């Protein structure tokens, strides 16, 4: 019965209905089909239970830290630092865009926040330097997917919560894949810069100038160091680390850099609360949906179907990569992880894939899906920021998506890329 709902589910998402309402609508339908439709309290009880979690508290705190950093002019300091390091290269601003995304990832962990904050600053600057608007928007969207891969990462917190994995292990496992995505984009830019004669932004900076730019960016760059250092050192949990990050961002904005005023704090908190509420509503709805799907025994049927395709884990991983890539185009990474993680995760663990490795495969696939046509969310954000049509950006982003797809398969078939750091530090076994 459930298989008939899948095309309808995708159709509703494609026509633009909010994911939250689609999930709840199907929750109600499936609840009724399972003869539990008369229990009206089950809806809000499942939503509440879905978000009543200590690990999920990290999401609003990391959102707040990102908003504080952005409002406090931190993005500008990161751009200036990146420009001092890479602005002299051909295609300098495109390289700066990617490097800034990698640095910003350590502050916000959000692809949407990355696209909005960096795009509003660099897309106009790139246009002035002679880049086409569609290229500037495309590289901004393509590099923004690094945000949820390099820690801290909201979707990895959700995965750890749903699957019972270590948040610290997932954070550490995302470092090298995130850097690999960034480097692959820079290599692509290098070849495109030669072909299209992209300009450099500045002459090569002196070590003195780089030192000054590094000092200006020092406090923002310390944020991921504090987060990961505190977790690795056993000083605080990932959830406590998120609160420390928010407090640190507020402190340096108000008292060290003095780029933030007290009167701005309520606005920052309101915006962070609004963004967090959207994420947590999606998580709650997806958890409710997952509960009723499990009642229909769909996970068991799907597991049998997947294992029936092949007993070769390499072939199955190839097929699942394609599935997750497609799912990521239409469904936000958080709900997708909640719905598909408990179904697919145990299958691949049984086939010998390490659970942390599969978490990274799934997270990177779904994250790249955010920038994939036709429905990738960050494409619409990039369109809104740049004023360029989504269709035009979608064509311009294809070379970058091809490179990111190659990286996904490297991560999939070479586990050491994601597993070396968590294994060496003892957070994965």
PLM regions and their residue ranges:
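Alpha-helical transmembrane segments of multi-pass membrane transport proteins
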Residues: 1-429
